[in-house]
């Protein structure tokens, strides 16, 4: 069973939902894997904490690049069966990096003194500012997301005027004149960047 925490729509699984997934996985003899590319955001927005993942999952990984790491994710294998031969499998499939220990230094730094969690909180706080500001302008959201991904429904004419200044991904055409798009905040998003986007949205409304 493969889950993303948070999901591609910015939603999060609660501890209760992860416990239910664990029970289903056990019932059918399946393993439970959690993709944690954006895990820092989920740990801020969900009641499912890092210790819960360690208790409930067979494997999960701690995302690094979305928290400022240059490369990589930290795979955490809890199921003893899956540890056997894992290093050799990585090497055989071309995933063993020379001097890979240098990648580990990034995670040692990220997990020291709560930095990883603070970066996740920073992303979520900026996303909430963006979400609340968009709502205050009278725009709707396609998805109710508590994490760093926000999905406003904006007029195509507004998006056309914003495209040279901002970056987003189009998710779905809502009708002939509106599109649901995805804005993502990052560990380095500043207050003034959110303010500038909201000001431009207000000006173009």
Regions found by a protein language model. Give the residues of each.
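Short, solvent-exposed amphipathic alpha-helical segments in soluble enzyme
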Residues: 18, 76-79, 91-92, 166-168, ...
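Active-site-proximal loop/turn and secondary-structure-junction residues that shape catalytic pockets
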Residues: 7, 38-40, 66, 187
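Glycine-rich, charge-decorated loop segments at or immediately adjacent to ligand/cofactor-binding or catalytic sites
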Residues: 40-46
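Structural preference for beta-strand elements that scaffold enzyme active sites
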Residues: 31-33, 59, 180-182
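Conserved C-terminal alpha-helix-loop-beta "cap" of PLP-dependent enzymes
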Residues: 128-203
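Active-site C-terminal subdomain of aminotransferase-like
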Residues: 1-13, 49-147
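Alpha-helical scaffolding segments of alpha/beta enzyme cores, especially the outer helices
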Residues: 16-23, 27, 48, 52-55, ...
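Active-site phosphate-binding strand-loop segment of PLP-dependent enzymes
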Residues: 1-36
């Amino acid at each position: 069973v493969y889950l993303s925490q948070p999901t591609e729509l910015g939603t999060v699984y609660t501890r209760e939902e992860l416990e239910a997934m664990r029970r289903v996985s056990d019932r059918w003899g399946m393993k439970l894997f959690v993709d944690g590319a954006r895990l820092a955001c989920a740990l801020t927005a969900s009641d499912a904490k890092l210790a819960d993942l360690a208790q409930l999952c067979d494997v999960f990984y701690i995302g690094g690049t979305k928290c400022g790491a240059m490369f990589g994710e930290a795979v955490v294998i809890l199921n003893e069966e899956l540890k056997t031969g894992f290093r050799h499998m990585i090497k055989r499939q071309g995933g063993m990096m020379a001097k890979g220990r240098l990648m580990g230094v990034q995670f040692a730094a990220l997990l020291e003194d709560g930095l990883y969690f603070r970066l996740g909180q920073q992303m979520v706080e900026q996303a909430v500012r963006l979400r609340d500001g968009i709502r205050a302008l009278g725009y709707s959201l396609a998805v109710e997301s508590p994490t760093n991904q926000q999905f406003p429904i904006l007029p195509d004419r507004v998006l056309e005027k914003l495209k040279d200044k901002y970056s987003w991904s189009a998710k779905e055409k809502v009708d002939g004149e509106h599109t649901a798009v995805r804005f993502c905040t990052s560990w380095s998003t500043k207050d003034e960047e959110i303010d500038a986007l909201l000001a431009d949205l207000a000006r173009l409304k």
